[in-house]
């Protein structure tokens, strides 16, 4: 069996990653592909926690920009992440991978409430744990959720899977042909240069708790496994 570099990971999936090329909604083919990749690493005895965004269904900031109360818009976004999490859970269990959804906002008919010790126990039993509903508080992104949960469960790394870029660049590679991709960065570089990796709250939390971050493309099948095995893909962010 191949030996993974990391034993306990947090996989951060953007909502857009679940939409695939259609841009919004949940693409069943894409979510099945992601579930198969998660199965690959679960079979290496890696403990897998997942944080899913909700941008394929709703963005709190968009609602706020249109005049909605920001807190209400953010709560709607949290509910969108629950829908995505349940879809991912279903795909995983179709493949025979036991999983649990834990929500920051209680909805016991749908999922377990988030309890740190229980989440760790699930991971130790090799169940995939999907953290839904963000932090349970408005004004905090799902990037911050990933950083917070990674600190709480003492994860070895955060794998940030992107659907539109394969790492961190000094400019937007979709609009600037001269954009240069970084292989390694520090969190101070990210904060100082305002690089679009994750928001500053999440970056600070990762830096303060010394949690490495790997940013890579989800669109190339097998990349999650490559990252877990320690292959050089995407961009790694760590330290001060």
Curated annotation (Swiss-Prot):
Record's subcellular location: Cytoplasm
Gene encoding the protein: pyrH
Protein origin, superkingdom: Bacteria
Role according to the record: Catalyzes the reversible phosphorylation of UMP to UDP.
Binding site for ATP: 12-15, 55, 59, 163, 169, 172
GO molecular function: ATP binding; UMP kinase activity
Species in which this protein is naturally found: Bacillus licheniformis (strain ATCC 14580 / DSM 13 / JCM 2505 / CCUG 7422 / NBRC 12200 / NCIMB 9375 / NCTC 10341 / NRRL NRS-1264 / Gibson 46)
E.C. designation(s): 2.7.4.22
Protein name: Uridylate kinase
Keywords: Allosteric enzyme, ATP-binding, Cytoplasm, Kinase, Nucleotide-binding, Pyrimidine biosynthesis, Transferase
Lineage: Bacteria, Bacillati, Bacillota, Bacilli, Bacillales
